[in-house]
């Protein structure tokens, strides 16, 4: 779909963002067709330099964007950025509270100059007692209930991906699109905000309500009583783990018939799902012993044939060879912009939607630092000699 007209084509977004939350918002808008311009300091978004578990941040969340490097503290740099903002429909930022105001690019100042601007802040917290605290995905998970629900009792555990950061970026994109639709009716922009803590609390809503409904403390996932009798990971004869779920009465009959468990199917004490959940201490050892005699491939094939919920336990690197992702075009090549492998090609996952039956593609590789500085300055009316002078004075890079 990269060559077709995209839904947000013609919308310009200027982003002052780093790490994951802010860039993921821009990624959503960029993949949907918006022109997203990443404003970076002269030495680049520090996310470019991250290693270890942060090495994938920049190339993953910055495709389909343009990069301009500017000294935001210089007079020339501020003039450039102000012109860039005046050309934009949307501004996004995820710096510490107050940082944009100190630079002269806060909402109050810009909304007076450009009432139609949609200004989106992505922060740790919405307005309230916590709003000036530094916020991270990790802190939101810890104080928002997710770490408690993920680890066993007494051992809170961070989820295995930056779920709050990415979700916060998506919620911000939703808010921006809502504000854009409203602007078509009113002609005015507005200030919108997304926050890590609140989106984690939103995730916890189902468990908060669970506690109200049951009148009991909510138990973390590893230690809780499952909602269904068979809803676990099981080890196969070749040492692998496979998840299998049996979540309806119909599936229970199919499961028992196919796996030779006629005694369990006929047992009146296991007729309903609540009865089977109560009998898990009896049911699970039987199922565990049964699956331990099967290989992983045998169990997966049988569950797929029966239409039962199942899943192999997959590592991130295994996804590159996933037959479904490969067959549906879910993986795409990008050029790595930084680090020891700069210039090499790597695969990344696409935005997980289709429009008109087609995936959203990559129009621009993750940019090198200042890759589009000259192009954007020319669009803003700077002559080639002026750009040369700005580069020589280190106002831009």
Where on the chain are the PLM-derived regions?
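Conserved Rossmann-fold dehydrogenase catalytic segment
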Residues: 153-161, 184-200, 219-226, 268-271
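Terminal low-complexity tails and localization/encapsulation signals of metabolic enzymes
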Residues: 1-12, 235-237, 318-397
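Oxidoreductase and adenylate-handling cofactor-binding alpha/beta cores
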Residues: 169-189, 202-214, 256-263
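N-terminal helix-loop segment corresponding to the beta1-alpha1 unit
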Residues: 1-175, 179-185, 368, 374-397
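Aromatic-enriched alpha-helical interface/lid elements that frame and gate functional surfaces
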Residues: 230-306, 310
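Mid-domain beta-loop-alpha active-site segment that forms a flexible
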Residues: 162-177, 196-204, 247, 251
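Short, well-structured beta-strand/strand-turn elements
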Residues: 36, 304-318, 383-388
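Glycine-rich beta-alpha junction loops
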Residues: 43, 124-126, 196-201, 238-240, ...
């Amino acid at each position: 779909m990269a060559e077709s007209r995209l839904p947000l084509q013609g919308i310009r977004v200027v982003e002052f963002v780093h790490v994951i939350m802010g860039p993921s918002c821009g990624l959503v808008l960029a993949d949907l067709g918006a022109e997203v311009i990443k404003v970076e300091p002269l030495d680049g978004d520090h996310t470019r330099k991250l290693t270890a578990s942060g090495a994938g941040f920049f190339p993953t969340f910055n495709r389909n964007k343009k990069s301009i490097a500017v000294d935001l503290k210089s007079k020339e740099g501020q003039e450039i950025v102000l012109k860039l903002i005046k050309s934009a429909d949307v501004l996004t930022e995820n710096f510490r509270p107050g940082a944009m105001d100190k630079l002269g690019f806060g909402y109050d100042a810009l909304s007076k100059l450009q009432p139609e601007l949609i200004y989106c802040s992505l922060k740790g917290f919405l307005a309230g007692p916590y709003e000036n605290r530094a916020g991270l995905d990790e802190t939101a998970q810890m104080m928002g209930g997710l770490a408690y629900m993920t680890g066993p009792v007494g051992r809170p555990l961070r989820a295995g991906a930056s779920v709050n950061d990415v979700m916060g970026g998506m919620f911000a994109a939703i808010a921006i699109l809502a504000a854009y639709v409203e602007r078509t009716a009113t002609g005015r922009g507005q200030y919108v905000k997304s926050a890590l803590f609140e989106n984690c609390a939103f995730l916890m809503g189902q468990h908060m309500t669970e506690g109200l409904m049951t009148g009991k403390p909510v138990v973390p996932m590893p230690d809780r009583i499952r909602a269904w009798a068979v809803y676990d990971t099981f080890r196969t004869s070749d040492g692998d783990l496979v998840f299998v779920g049996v979540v309806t009465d119909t599936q229970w009959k199919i499961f028992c018939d196919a796996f030779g468990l006629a005694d369990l199917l006929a047992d009146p004490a296991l007729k309903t799902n609540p009865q089977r959940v109560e009998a898990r201490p009896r049911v699970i050892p039987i199922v565990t012993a049964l699956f331990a005699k099967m290989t992983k491939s045998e169990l997966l094939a049988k569950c797929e044939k029966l239409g039962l919920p199942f899943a192999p336990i997959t590592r991130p690197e295994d996804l590159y060879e996933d037959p479904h992702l490969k067959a549906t075009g879910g993986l795409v090549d990008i050029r790595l912009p930084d680090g020891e492998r700069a210039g090499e090609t790597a695969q990344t996952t696409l935005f997980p939607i289709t429009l008109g039956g087609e995936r959203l593609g990559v129009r621009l590789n993750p940019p090198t630092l200042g890759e589009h500085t000259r192009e954007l300055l020319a669009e803003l009316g700077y002559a080639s000699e002026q750009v040369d002078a700005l580069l020589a004075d280190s106002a831009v890079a």
